[in-house]
């Protein structure tokens, strides 16, 4: 007879950064996991006497922290990485990306591109991602098979694409997808109206009603450029954020991507409706779209999180790099060295993102009772020495390549920097094959 507590997995490490409670850092402790849940965080010295465990992984040089959550991207667009650079948003979209999508995007493209993106995200510490792209059923299936947590937002536009004929068709297909994944814990289906300038009033009203009925998230590009805002004022008499508020689309389940153009009226709306802002600093910088005033948002207690956007406009999917850029940019925009500190940047990529997704009760921090989504980072490197401030190192020393292990729901998806549920060679081979086809078509001028 034993009084030991049963456990499936124990992972011990030099440090554990739980994110919540704020300011806590465990040293020489271990995460104890059973049935995909964190059941304890205890000193490593006591695990043998307290637990009857199936597996123990000791990582003496590593930091454990919550898995990162990429709040906005277009995963399959990784196959368009570097296709068109050094261009403003609308020229980039209209002259390069939309024509390429019309030529190449189908279900196989989305499957292959999503697998490429997931491989990159997992290897750099992302355990959960929000996606908005065509053929969302392919992305959802790929995420489920890989064991990643995901919010898949089905696209809605006024005009036809290869995935649908118009708003009614997009919504019909999206609702079917939502039904298919209703009981799948790892995959959440949301509404993805592309932008205020590509979706008209009636579809936006319907989305608002349906999302409320289904308790589903809404993710939309919003205030990405100054032109978007000025066009809305010219065409509708109000700024885009006010327009979607008037249509019933703004609320605590709404995730607003970019928000580089913000005035006092916008701040008031965001506060009143408890909407979330997704900051994509590297994409905004690359497309010269503007600067999201993150420090101002946070001063008004507006939940702000991080996304990479797609690799076609970034051009990588490293959230650690995004944290670094966000922190530096936040200081520059606010003209305050104490703006967007390392703690804040880490929260934006973890608990804030989980809050925006409505998942902060299960992920986003390492706490007893939450799901075991966490990563390990090796700090036994020259570029991390000496270690005075771990959180500063996480944000400021480019650690994405130092991720050694990744767990989602207690399952190991990366071990010793090797993918466990995705085939690296196959993914790379398919990406190269797409490159050959796309380059040949572009060279022919067809």
Curated annotation (Swiss-Prot):
HAMAP family: MTA_SAH_deamin. One of its GO terms (molecular function) is 5'-methylthioadenosine deaminase activity. The keyword S-adenosyl-L-methionine does not apply. Keywords: Hydrolase, Metal-binding, Zinc. It comes from the Bacteria. InterPro entries: Amidohydro-rel, Deaminase_MtaD/DadD, Metal-dep_hydrolase_composite, Metal_Hydrolase, MTA/SAH_deaminase. It is an enzyme of class 3 (hydrolase). Catalyzes the deamination of 5-methylthioadenosine and S-adenosyl-L-homocysteine into 5-methylthioinosine and S-inosyl-L-homocysteine, respectively. Is also able to deaminate adenosine. Binds 1 zinc ion per subunit. It catalyses: S-adenosyl-L-homocysteine + H2O + H(+) = S-inosyl-L-homocysteine + NH4(+); S-methyl-5'-thioadenosine + H2O + H(+) = S-methyl-5'-thioinosine + NH4(+). This is 5-methylthioadenosine/S-adenosylhomocysteine deaminase. Its cofactor is Zn(2+). The keyword Zinc applies. Belongs to the metallo-dependent hydrolases superfamily. MTA/SAH deaminase family. Substrate binds at residues 101, 194, 224, 309. It holds the Pfam family Amidohydro_1. CDD domains: ATZ_TRZ_like. Zn(2+) binds at residues 72, 74, 221, 309. It comes from Saccharophagus degradans (strain 2-40 / ATCC 43961 / DSM 17024). Its EC number is 3.5.4.28, 3.5.4.31.
